[in-house]
Amino acid sequence: MSLLTEVETYVLSIVPSGPLKAEIAQRLEDVFAGKNTDLEALMEWLKTRPILSPLTKGILGFVFTLTVPSERGLQRRRFVQNALNGNGDPNNMDRAVKLYKKLKREITFHGAKEVALSYSTGALASCMGLIYNRMGTVTTEVAFGLVCATCEQIADSQHRSHRQMVTTTNPLIRHENRMVLASTTAKAMEQMAGSSEQAAEAMEVASQARQMVHAMRTIGTHPSSSAGLKDDLLENLQAYQKRMGVQMQRFK
């Protein structure tokens, strides 16, 4: 796996799924391929994106700044600086300075990532802030190691919280989760459908599922009533894909 592929993988792992994630993936690919060289426009676009947390925007802004060639005097962006200040906690800043000194001695991406993984997310963000604000310089490889370590920590905590939700025994949360998943699956079916005869069938199934979820939410139903709803939908989606000769395992 190339360095940039690895960076893209880690950064995208902390972006919530949805159309915006696809857009960000495209922007990252363009930047890494040298196709997008207007850093100013890129940062303006990033600043106005909804849904993303300030820290995620800060990390993306840091990656764009590292990758896109720009004039030396280009102004640093406030939204990135604010996100990478370690919540203003002096402890984070102290640890960030210690980490920075260690990173200065590293020359490889993996070496930097290993060193960084033993620090808290706040300290890692502060260290990125130091580099972003030109208070310190490290090689691009080392900076990317720092980025990936930060993303790994964030993704780990997101995964833990996701696992807690999936394994919860609270029937109301499980019920709502099934309905949300059914809705997003229906949306995916509608987006994939296109305009063939089978597509009309897929649209019909998706539409019925959405109406059902809407009705369940409106009138309130027993928490077990949604069991199997997403599975039925996925079964329909896979049958439709088979007929269309499409194999999309990623919906599982």
From Swiss-Prot:
Q: Where in the cell is it found?
A: Virion membrane; Host nucleus
* UniProt cross-references to HAMAP family, sorted A to Z: INFV_M1
Protein name from the UniProt record: Matrix protein 1
Instruction: Share what the entry says about its subunit structure, partners included.
Output: Homodimer and homomultimer. Interacts with NEP. Binds ribonucleocapsid by both interacting with genomic RNA and NP protein. May interact with HA and NA. Cannot bind NP without genomic RNA.
- Segments carrying the region annotation (RNP-binding) are 165-252
Per the record, the similarity remark reads: Belongs to the influenza viruses Matrix protein M1 family.
Miscellaneous note, as given in the UniProt record, is: Most abundant protein in virion. When expressed alone can form virus-like particles in transfected cells.
